[in-house]
Amino acid sequence: MARHGDTRSPSPVGSTYSSSRRSRRDDDRYERSRRDDGRSYRRSRSPEKRYRDRERDRDSYRRRDRSLDRRADYRDEDTYRPSRRDRSRDRRRSRDRDDDRDYRRRSRDRDFRSRRDDSRDRARRRTDDSADLKHKSRRDDSRERARDSVPRSREASKPSTPAANTGPTDDEKRAERLAKLEAWKQKQAAEKERKQREAAAAGGTRSILDEIDRKSGLSPAVGSPQSSATPIDAAPASYTGKFDPKAIAKNAAPAPAVKSVLGDDIAVPPSAKTSATFPSTKTEVQANKPSATSSKASSLKVKGNVGSFGLGTKQAADTEKASATKTLGFGEEESTRRKLERLPTPPLDDAKDSNKEEDVTAEDEDDDVDMQDGDTEEENAAAARAAAERREERLQNEARDSQSNGDVQMSDASNQKAPDKMEVDAQEEEEVDPLDAFMSELAESAPPKKTAGAKFAKAKPQQPEALFGDENDMDMTAVGDGDADDFLAIANKAKKKKDIPTVDHKKVEYEPFRKKFYTEPSDLAAMSEEEAASLRLELDGIKVRGVEVPRPVSKWSQCGLGVQTLDVIDRLGYSAPTSIQAQAIPAIMSGRDVIGVAKTGSGKTIAFLIPMFRHIKDQRPLENMEGPVGLIMTPTRELATQIHKDCKPFLKALNLRAVCAYGGAPIKDQIADLKRGAEIIVCTPGRMIDLLAANAGRVTNLRRVTYVVLDEADRMFDMGFEPQVMKILANVRPDKQTVLFSATFPRNMEALARKTLNKPVEIVVGGRSVVAPEITQIVEVRSEDKKFIRLLELLGNLYSTDENEDARALIFVERQEGADTLLRELMRKGYPCMSIHGGKDQIDRDSTIEDFKAGIFPVLIATSVAARGLDVKQLKLVVNYDAPNHLEDYVHRAGRTGRAGNTGTAVTFLTEDQERYSVDIAKALKQSGQSVPEPVQKMVDSFLEKVKAGKEKASASGFGGKGLERLDQERDAARMRERKTYKTGDEGEEEEEKEEKNEKAEEQFNKVLSSVQSAAAPSLPGVPKGIDLDGKITVHKTEKDANGSKNPLDKVGSAVADIHARLSRAGVMRSGVPIDNRGPDAGAFHATLEINDFPQKARWAVTNRTNVAKILEATGTSITTKGSFYATGKEPGPGENPKLYILVEGETELSVTNAMRELMRLLKEGTIAAADSDARAPVGGRYNVL
């Protein structure tokens, strides 16, 4: 920080910045006007031009007048002090630089250095230091020449400048500086006391670090103004900045006697702010002074520059310089204190001229102080942070060393090794290359080290991760130290289907709940049994089984419902309960388990929803993370969506919440809805299991479930769904109330369902598996090619009248491929339609159903996925384009029309080879009271005769399902264990079963290979049935053309070779395929492999560029794909290209054999993969496990 007295104007010492700035400009103008013609050259501010002029024109122009007279004119205390030192650090940075000031500053080395630091960008200061040192040395030479060359008369013409180099002037200045120094010392002592009290009061990390420093013996000499009384070595150990050649020269100059105290003086101070920011000023300024003189001045210099920003700082610096002028002979600039950019750079040549340069040295020191104080506080803060980080690192190293195997403590090592370490550092610093030093300075962004050889500075630099080593080791062990078996176990565990644990209900304490809410009205209680039977007969012939079955109701008011529920029922337009509702609602609200079987469109959904709402409202509200109370499971996603939609009118009125969870939709949304809480969940079994197993069972649970509904129960208990449904029911409390509803309920399904019920009441309305009488059923026997024409006729008749303009038509097919094909054909004929099946995305299925219900398109093509539960208004025509394969499916398909008392038509197409399905259709017609057409009856009779003769097996009702492969394997494993345990004597049968399995596997593979042969191949004698991919590979030697040979024996031999090649089993072409490898570039050996009739995946495997490139690189052969592809059953005609095949050519028989073996392996793998993908493809029209 510059003191206020440094100004050229005659203003007082305390002049302000603005007055200093103004006086300097006036002086500059005066000085410029007094220059002679030789000095009228206009100087530019650019450093390039300035350096060039200095080298070329120093003697001729004599622009740099540094004579003692001129210098003495400005040495007066009132006029010599530069005004720029009055400025604060912030104002200096933003100050304008004008030409007048530049003109003056060029005449003095001090101003030249300061202007250089201010005018350039701060980021370039360090880069230009080495170049500046070079010019500084040249400038010193010019000082001697300037003394003799400048005439004395020039100085005499300045009235404001006193005489130069007078002794009294120097004494007066020295006395004033000493007085100011004493005042500054007192102020600094008080300031340090205050800071120490604040630090002691604050405590914390700073106190701990200070204590560690004291224990380490590294307390610096800046603890007090009087702390340093020993001379300092000229080579500071803390230097890590830019390399300076003059620093090396100065390092060699000092006497070796001062090295003993170097380690004590240059150390890490306890204060981050002081030690990190100002590490090396004391050493640099006092480089070559005697120890007696430098002792006091060094301590004052360091303390003043570090801790104070006022008048005392400058006075201390002046006093120090005045005492050093008689002995310090190096007129060089010092390095900046905060950034450590420069080292003391005394030229060896100028040592003898130290007495003549003492004034210049003093001025240079003033300049150095000025530049040191010009740094920003951000740099100070950054240096302080870096010092704190180094202390943290030292603490960590101490902690690590204390836990190591007998390492010496850090404090002892640093105290013992400091002097020797410093000597090593000094030697290394002298030998360092300038480029290496510069690059290392760029690489090190942290402030320079301040340790005098302390050992902790380099303690274990390669192990910074030791702090977190335990955590990293744990992670690495978990992943990297595992065996291959662990990975296999993890992979197998991930592949397993999500499962839910079985609940032990004996260990769970469930809340009691009430089931019975129904109180029989007096008018119904007074009714006799005969009157009740007559009422059931009037209600479509209701049949009931069970003990104490309630009598059916005839009005909604008799059901014991709440006002809100009755209002919603009235708003929906339900005037009176339907047959199933009249009997099922009283039975369910009485707390009984119920099996309800009723025709399609009879209102079964409302029959189980209304009692559920009453059941839920009787229980306490849900708390956080409690599961639902009512659980409704359906077999299809569309039915789940429809039931959820039917719930919505009641949910708002009763203040309840419901969630619809089904596969295909994003599970995250369903999890979020469940976590918010829902009293009702409508779901499919597969997605329900996923939700129960998600997040270790924390998403939802079944502890609160007391009311369970299985809609379309016969399908839910079929082989496909039964394991999942039973798994879910096993996790619900045993005293739950269970309700089953369906339009069809075979006896075998009923027996299975009764195992989950407790004394159920069975309600059957209109018979089991019966089509509603409101539906007109038409069954026609037609060939496959005439069905589409008949379909167009039916659609044309439907939409021919205006009254059916808004009618809908639903067409059922057996398979997904059939649905897409029929969709394409109908759209070509101009009918707007859509298709729905299990192969489509769920969002497409949902949107298609909604659009169909809204009438956006009138025709929908669907598989049996839309056969159950779908309720569409204005649906007047159902066409079974492909006949259903069992009775229940037919009833549900036909039941999509004629709902809620409306009429409809169901048309079914049968082909002549579908005799098996005709039996169930004829049975449905008879049960619904309709006549069976004669062609259909003939088909039924023919099939029954075949059954009697044992040629056909009678079809069973129900889906039957395909079963689950995993369950079949578990049953087989259990049976095998029993056989081995009990030795039942069936071991022979076991061997026979194994042989049968092997035969089946071989037969399956032969079927795959049989698809390779052409359609006409089996009828040709002598041709193999399939290509033997594991057989012997035949490699032929390439025959060269006999140029112009007319020998008939050669032609016969060639023909015989062709015949043998065509009849070989593997590796060559079959009949009609020539071997066109007799060209000039043909290899010595060749083989062919036909791939035309293999599946597409297999052909891709052997023609893929990547696979072929690998074979070429491994074998060195040539592989060429030739021929043309022909569809299955099509043979190439005369003159056409042969079937697609691969030609392999090579120089050796072994290379061709290896290439053929690899191609056959790829072909076999591709064939098996194609067969597996076909087996995994979903079967259209079937229900899949959700």
Swiss-Prot record:
Motif stretch (DEAD box): 711-714
Superkingdom per UniProt: Eukaryota
Alphabetically ordered keywords of this record: ATP-binding, Helicase, Hydrolase, mRNA processing, mRNA splicing, Nucleotide-binding, Nucleus
Residue spans of biased composition, Basic and acidic residues class: 24-157, 170-198, 349-359, 387-401, 963-986
Chief location category: nucleus
Ranges where the Helicase ATP-binding domain occurs: 585-763
UniProt name for this protein: Pre-mRNA-processing ATP-dependent RNA helicase prp5
Phylogenetic placement of the source organism: Eukaryota, Fungi, Dikarya, Ascomycota, Pezizomycotina
